[in-house]
From Swiss-Prot:
GO molecular function: rRNA binding; structural constituent of ribosome
InterPro entries registered for this protein in UniProt: Ribosomal_uS19, Ribosomal_uS19_bac-type, Ribosomal_uS19_CS, Ribosomal_uS19_SF
Keywords attached to this entry: Ribonucleoprotein, Ribosomal protein, RNA-binding, rRNA-binding
Function: Protein S19 forms a complex with S13 that binds strongly to the 16S ribosomal RNA.
Name of protein: Small ribosomal subunit protein uS19
UniProt organism field: Rhodospirillum rubrum (strain ATCC 11170 / ATH 1.1.1 / DSM 467 / LMG 4362 / NCIMB 8255 / S1)
GO cellular component terms given for this protein: cytoplasm; small ribosomal subunit
Length: 92
């Protein structure tokens, strides 16, 4: 179920402060965040965020197409190795 329109998009408060500091400093450094649940806002376009996936920080460069999505969508938490092949089929 989608979030109620009257509530507005969810974003952790500290995230806006971090983004503003990064914009004012002018340096293009990775902003480390743990908030995968926060919505990407238009103010974040052009910034690089390091989104934590439980193991490491995945660098995510925010573009205009990402606005409205969640940070967690761009940092997968699970690695898929494929299904194990049948050992009998390999022998033949």
């Amino acid at each position: 179920m989608a979030r109620s329109v009257w509530k507005g998009p969810f974003i952790d408060g500290y995230l806006l402060n971090k983004a503003e500091k990064a914009r004012s400093s002018g340096r293009n450094e990775v902003i480390k965040i743990w908030s995968r649940r926060s919505t990407i806002m238009p103010q974040f376009v052009g910034l690089t965020f390091g989104v934590y996936n439980g193991q490491k920080f995945v660098p995510v460069l925010v573009t205009e197409q990402m606005v409205g999505h969640k940070f967690g969508e761009f940092a997968p938490t699970r690695t898929y190795y494929g299904h194990a092949a049948d050992k009998k089929a390999k022998r033949k």
